[in-house]
C-alpha cells in the first residue's frame, strides 16, 4: 500500500540533505584495499526506519478492509513517498554503521543506500562481507541479492 503524502510533503519543512560527492568517497578507499564487496540496500528508504512517536500522527490514515468499518491507522516506520525518506534513511544507516567494527583490515564506505566494503585480501573480504551482512540483518536492513557484488577484485 502506498499512501498519497503530497499534503504532508507540502506541510513539512524540507530537510536540506547533503549528498556526498562519490569521488570524495572513493578517495577514502585505503591503498591496501584489493578486494571489495558492494551491497545495495533493498527498499532502503522506508519500512526499516522507525518513526519517532511524536511524528506518527502526521502519517495517520483511514483504512477500510472489505466488510469492515473504517479504522484509523498510522505508520510507525518511515513510509514510502515521504520526501525526506532518503535523507532520514541515510542518517540512520550512518549512525548504525558507527557500531560496526571491521577491525584494522576493513573499511566500509556509504553512498546513500549503497555500501562498499574494502579489504586487503580475499580471506578478510569474505569475513567482512559476512560480518556486514549479519550486522545489517540484525538491524532490520535488507540487501538486494541481485545487485550484490560479493568479494571481487573489481566492482562497478
What are these regions (language model features)?
Residues 1-156:
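Retroelement reverse transcriptase polymerase core
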